[in-house]
Regions:
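Gly/Ser/Thr-enriched, mixed-charge loops and adjacent short helices
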Residues: 1-113
């Protein structure tokens, strides 16, 4: 958002939305149910990924969060042999003892299960960490470097540049 718009929004918030008519009840809008939304999203991700994970035996920790339904459909479709943990979200247990904030559980599962690697998402699936077959953490810097090098080799890294935030 432009700074001017953001500042205007802040003024409304600071003044408890004075001057804005808030809709309630039937005035708010309508709800439309789409049962195919998840599959549409998985299809979009699949078509966006230019890779084949055939032969990769991976353990994926979904943090009892947003990635639980998506990952279980996407990664096998990419050819990976997958075992999933943290796939029972109940609205209260997101990140509880699982996911990228508790990587030790994935590291242990990878070593004990003989997996090639592990991937752990955070609850809202906007970040992930990983580990190698020995359970050694692979942080975001390493993951980005590997992805950038692979994209560069394939001529898909615009300007040979990866742009990230300090939180990456």
């Amino acid at each position: 958002l432009p700074d001017e718009v953001e500042n205007e929004i802040e003024v409304y918030i600071d003044n408890d939305c004075a001057g804005i008519e808030l809709k309630t009840g039937a005035e708010v809008g309508r709800v439309y149910r789409r049962d195919d939304g998840l599959q549409d999203y998985v299809d979009h991700l699949y078509e966006s990924i230019h890779g084949d994970l055939t032969g990769l035996n991976v353990c994926i920790d979904c943090a009892n969060g947003a990635s639980a339904a998506v990952a279980q459909k996407l990664f096998p479709r990419l050819g990976a042999k997958c075992t999933f943990i943290g796939i029972a979200p109940d609205g209260q247990n997101i990140n509880r003892g699982v996911g990228s904030t508790h990587l030790e559980n994935l590291e242990k599962a990878v070593v004990e299960g003989g997996f090639d690697c592990g991937i752990a998402f955070d609850g809202d699936a906007d970040r992930c960490l990983g580990c190698d077959e020995k359970g050694h953490e692979m942080d975001g810097d390493k993951i980005i470097a590997l992805l950038a090098m692979t994209m560069k080799e394939k001529g898909r890294l615009d300007g040979d540049t990866a742009v990230v935030t300090v939180m990456s």
